[in-house]
Curated annotation (Swiss-Prot):
Changing R126A: Loss of host furin or a furin-like protease activity. Does not affect subcellular localization. Foamy viruses are distinct from other retroviruses in many respects. Their protease is active as an uncleaved Pro-Pol protein. Mature particles do not include the usual processed retroviral structural protein (MA, CA and NC), but instead contain two large Gag proteins. Their functional nucleic acid appears to be either RNA or dsDNA (up to 20% of extracellular particles), because they probably proceed either to an early (before integration) or late reverse transcription (after assembly). Foamy viruses have the ability to retrotranspose intracellularly with high efficiency. The mature envelope protein consists of a trimer of SU-TM heterodimers. The N-terminus of leader peptide specifically interacts with Gag protein. This specific interaction between Gag protein and Env glycoprotein may allow particle egress. It holds the Pfam family Foamy_virus_ENV. The chain crosses the membrane at residues 66-88, 961-981. InterPro entries: Foamy_env. This is Envelope glycoprotein gp130. GO terms for cellular component: host cell endoplasmic reticulum membrane; membrane; viral envelope; virion membrane. Envelope glycoproteins are synthesized as an inactive precursor that is processed by host furin or a furin-like proprotein convertase (PC)-mediated cleavage proteolysis to yield a functional heterooligomeric complex. Further proteolytically processed through regulated intramembrane proteolysis either by SPPL2A and SPPL2B or by SPPL3 in a PC-mediated cleavage-dependent or -independent manner, respectively. The transmembrane protein and the surface protein are N-glycosylated. The ER retention signal plays an important role in establishing the intracellular site of budding. Keywords: Cleavage on pair of basic residues, Glycoprotein, Host endoplasmic reticulum, Host membrane, Isopeptide bond, Membrane, Signal-anchor, Transmembrane, Transmembrane helix, Ubl conjugation, Viral envelope protein, Virion. The record marks R126, S127, R571, S572 as: Cleavage.
Length: 988
């Protein structure tokens, strides 16, 4: 295709065309003249005029066929844009008119009642096929719900938090202390240790150890006291003035009953029975008691070699059976502890050495029995080690013939009551044991054997008597009958003992060396003989020591040395808070605000939280009953019950208030009894470590670190109602819409005659509902500035049926149609008196004893006018509009809704559906236009759906891409057309 002519060429061409036209019609000009004229025109200098330039511009725009087609395409595009713009403008004008039309008015507080008769058939006995309808009246009661909100009882109290306090506590469990208080045997001790280990190990298996920023309790005085008291409360070290042992191998203690099983009265087992020498009838030939037992007599007691060592310089004992009258077993354990601590404070002066007045007179010439009592005659029966190791002198109580030179012939002289006892019948009226010796003398000690028998020979001791007199000496000591009693004093060792308290040593040394180091050293000191003294029975916990070092050496090592450096390192690295988070353990619910753990801003709590009395507590303090009055197995059962309950409570993160003094807490917080009930109920606990501090076959010790989080209430709301927002249905512009009012409250509270509307923030459920913030708000529709409430509209499909069974036996119904004469669109509470079917569901009657609630919340009356296109608004985009009780201010809401709707692109999605939607919206406003739009929409979606509908729909979804491509092509076309315009360069 040839390019367009230049301006000079076009002017010449234009003149030549005009010359040809003029010469064709002329007959006077010859052909030669015509050629001459054309040559002149071609050679003529051309000066284009403005008119020529304009005409040349039009020529260049349409010089070729492609340029003509481009102009035609541009005109078509512009025409389409104009037509579509006009259509959109008309549609938006109509849309604006539809928006400005006011919609329906929702008015609540309407009560309806209906009775209808569903037919039920009944057979007649004469004919099985014949059935007659029998009317049965079913009553349906319907009550509309104000503002589409139902209020159901909220049984849980709502607690408003004033603050949260964090308290820590260490619980110590030592089975040996428990066993000693309950006087358990070794077998029962082992069972108790197994029970404690089982419960604590099961707790430890489900708890992880970590650290919380509360400070180490081992640095606190209360922890040191409790730990030392638990381990060494009744442990003392006695230092002889000069080492000296028991003088003989024998021990005469006829005041003690003998062991064995005897008919009639039986005595409680005595500790001294372990040292009893039984008289055997048969012995090997030439057997001699002196060769085996030394000076100890058969039928009496001997002193073991382990106790009768000459080089013993100290005695270590752990027993509370040496205390004087101030320590009463009828007192509670806490009272005795308080008395003991006061005694030790008064009887020591900055060291573990007791003052002389604390000792009995037997131990010191300055003794006044301030702490310990005198050893009596019967103590040797139950505490033989005490007498052997600690007596400075011993008074033997003997009924043996020959002691004190007493013989049968001298009884009348020695015992006035026995005068003439063997010379007349006076003995017939006296006790059978009266005026007799327990053991009688024989001529000599010998064995008599049969010929050839060497192993089993009859043995005749030097002193002998019948075993039936096993309680002879005890009855004589009780003065039940006259008897020739010989009492001889034996000097054992010198007075002026020095006594040291291991509890005081532990408490004082811990301040210097640390509790762990001191416990380690003192426990080793108790285990000096290979068996811990504090694990022995109270009556037998006395051992002799040879020049022990006291106080023991305390190695200058760190605390982690004894608590395992590896374990401490692991606690600080692996089990820290970051590790817990990575493992999935969240402490958010347990330790909410670490800064509140030590809340000492309150003057009433400054001393309490720092010096928390129950920061450290032992299991013995927390038991409900005094186990010292229980039998062995009953005490174990009682403690097992407590431990199991404690473990269960800790697993549920609750607090076992048996282990914490609520009276102290109530006094510090100055709360009433009812408030303390709430505090106890919602308090939470957290176990942050469980560790075993000691273990042996018969004893075990555990520690449990507890963190308590106490929520202090500011106010407690009772008698509450919960909000169930069911909403309302609206049918408008061909669209079913679910409308709900967003009330500013969730709870209605009724206290006395005052009704409060509560908005809850930052709440959590822990038996009760605990909220950090509770705001009292105003309900909707009370014509105040703060009562405007947002309304939410949601497009739903028909048919819409929502039935919610209520706890009182009624049903909450919201439906778009009517059934059983239940009105549509209005939320209603429906109650029936017989089972019936509505909306395809069975409605059943409530319980017979059901009664209507006495209190029903009342709300201000509210008439709500909605926009005409509320359904379409909700379908296109969820709009939040505020609703007030006045009709004038709703116009402002409609204006805001109109502005929002006009901003929307109404051509998105399916074009036929949108046109039909516009027709439905226009139906009530402009019926003719609505019919036309409906016809267009039906045509596009019906007959021409395959062509236009789908195409338009696809174009609608691809509109952004198509518009972009179209704009690019249009720009290219415009630039092309502009390039055709002749410029100065082209014109030249």
């Amino acid at each position: 295709m040839a390019p367009p002519m230049t301006l000079q060429q076009w002017i010449i061409w234009n003149k030549m065309n005009k010359a040809h036209e003029a010469l064709q019609n002329s007959t006077t000009v010859t052909d030669q003249q015509k050629e001459q004229i054309i040559l002149e025109i071609q050679n003529e200098e051309v000066r284009p005029t403005r008119k020529d330039k304009i005409r040349y511009l039009l020529y260049t725009c349409c010089a070729t066929s492609s340029r003509v087609l481009a102009w035609m395409l541009l005109v078509c595009v512009l025409l389409i844009v104009v037509l579509v713009s006009c259509f959109l403008t008309i549609s938006r004008i109509q849309w604006n008119r539809d928006i400005q039309v006011l919609g329906p008015v929702i008015d609540w507080n309407v009560t309806q009642r209906a009775v209808y008769q569903p037919l039920q058939t009944r057979r007649i006995a004469r004919s099985l096929r014949m059935q007659h309808p029998v009317p049965k009246y079913i009553e349906v009661n319907m009550t509309s719900i104000p503002q589409g909100v139902y209020y159901e009882p909220h049984p849980e109290p709502i607690v408003v938090t004033e603050r949260v306090l964090g308290l820590s506590q260490v619980l110590m469990i030592n089975s040996e202390n428990i066993a000693n208080n309950a006087n358990l045997t070794q077998e029962v001790k082992k069972l108790l240790a197994e029970v404690v280990n089982e419960e604590m190990q099961s707790l430890s298996d489900v708890m992880i150890d970590f650290e919380i920023p509360l400070g180490d309790p081992r640095d606190q005085e209360q922890y040191i006291h409790r730990k030392c008291y638990q381990e060494f409360a009744h442990c003392y070290l006695v230092k002889y003035k000069t080492p000296k042992s028991w003088p003989t191998e024998g021990l005469i203690a006829d005041q003690c009953p003998l062991p064995g099983y005897h008919a009639g009265l039986s005595y409680k087992p005595q500790s001294i029975w372990d040292y009893y020498i039984k008289v055997e009838i048969t012995r090997p030939a030439n057997w001699s008691s002196q060769a085996v037992y030394g000076q100890a007599r058969l039928g009496s007691f001997y002193v073991p070699k382990g106790i009768r060592q000459n080089n013993y310089s100290h005695v270590l004992f752990c027993s509370d059976q040496l205390y004087s009258k101030w320590y009463n077993i009828e007192n509670s354990i806490e009272q005795n502890e308080k008395f003991l601590l006061n005694k030790l404070d008064n009887l020591t002066t900055g060291s573990s050495l007791l003052k002389k007045r604390a000792l009995p007179k037997e131990w010191s010439s300055q003794g006044k029995n301030a702490l310990f009592k005198e050893i009596n005659v019967l103590d040797v029966c139950s505490k033989p080690e005490l007498v052997i190791l600690l007596n400075t002198s011993y008074y033997s109580f003997s009924l043996w013939e020959g002691d004190c030179n007493f013989t049968k012939n001298m009884i009348s002289q020695l015992v006035p009551e026995c005068e003439g006892f063997y010379n007349n019948s006076k003995w017939m009226h006296m006790h059978p044991y009266a005026c007799r010796f327990w053991r009688s003398k024989n001529e000599k000690e010998e064995t008599k054997c049969r010929p050839g028998e060497k192993e089993k020979c009859l043995y005749y001791p030097y002193q002998d008597s019948l075993e039936s007199t096993y309680d002879f000496g005890f009855l004589a000591y009780q003065k039940n009958f006259p008897a020739p009693i010989c009492i001889e004093q034996q000097e054992i060792r010198d007075k002026d003992y020095e006594v040291y308290s291991l509890y005081q040593e532990c408490k004082l040394a811990s301040k210097v060396h640390g509790i762990d180091t001191v416990l380690f050293s003192l426990k080793n000191f108790l285990n000096h003989t290979g068996r811990p003294v504090n694990e022995m029975p109270n009556a037998r916990a006395f051992v002799g020591l040879v020049d022990p070092k006291f106080p023991p050496s305390y190695p200058n090592v760190t605390r982690e040395h004894y608590t395992s450096c590896n374990n401490r390192k692991r606690r600080s690295t692996d089990n820290n808070y970051a590790k817990l988070k990575s493992m999935g353990y969240a402490l958010t619910g347990a330790v909410q605000t670490l800064s509140q753990i030590s809340d000492i801003n309150d003057e009433n709590l400054q001393q309490g939280i720092y010096l928390l009395r129950d920061h450290v507590i032992t299991l013995m303090e927390a038991t409900l009953h005094d186990i010292s009055v229980m039998e062995g197995m009953f005490a174990v059962q009682h403690l097992h019950t407590h431990l199991n309950h404690l473990k269960t409570m800790l697993l549920e993160r609750r607090i076992d208030w048996t282990y914490m003094s609520s009276a102290w807490l109530q006094q510090q917080l100055q709360k009433s009894d009812d408030e303390m009930k709430v505090i106890k109920r919602i308090a939470k606990s957290l176990v942050y470590y469980v560790k075993q501090t000691y273990n042996s076959p018969t004893a075990t010790a555990w520690e449990i670190g507890l963190y308590y989080e106490l929520t202090i209430p500011k106010h407690v709301y009772l008698n509450n109602w919960n909000v169930v927002n069911i909403g309302h249905l609206v049918q408008s512009a061909g669209q079913l819409t679910h409308v709900t009012i967003a009330h500013p409250y969730e709870i209605i509270n009724k206290e006395c005659t005052e009704t409060k509307y509560l908005h809850l923030k930052d709440c959590r459920r822990q038996d009760y509902v605990i909220c950090d913030v509770v705001e009292i708000v105003q309900p909707c529709g009370n014509s105040t500035d703060t009562s405007d409430c947002p309304v939410w509209a949601e497009a739903v499909k028909e048919p819409f049926v929502q039935v919610n069974p209520l706890k009182n036996g009624s049903y909450l119904v919201l439906a778009s149609s009517t059934d059983c004469q239940i009105p549509p669109y209005v939320p209603s509470i429906v109650t029936v008196n017989e089972t019936t079917s509505c909306y395809g569901l069975n409605f059943k009657k409530p319980l017979v004893a059901e009664e209507r609630l006495g209190f029903e919340p009342r709300l201000p009356n509210l008439q709500l006018r909605l926009p005409h296109l509320v359904g379409i608004i909700a379908k296109i985009k969820g709009l939040k509009i505020e609703v007030t009780s006045s009709g004038e201010s709703i116009k402002d809401q409609i204006e805001r809704a109109k502005a929002e709707l006009l901003r929307l692109d109404i051509h998105e999605g399916d074009t036929p559906a949108w046109i039909q939607q516009l027709a439905a919206a226009t139906k009530d406003v402009w019926p003719a236009a609505a019919s036309a739009l409906q016809g267009i929409g039906n045509f596009l979606s019906g007959a021409a759906h395959g062509i236009f509908g789908t195409a338009f729909s696809l174009l609608g979804y691809l509109k952004p891409i198509l518009i972009g491509v179209g704009v690019i092509l249009l720009i290219i076309l415009i630039f092309k057309i502009v390039s055709w315009i002749p410029t100065k360069k082209k014109s030249q």
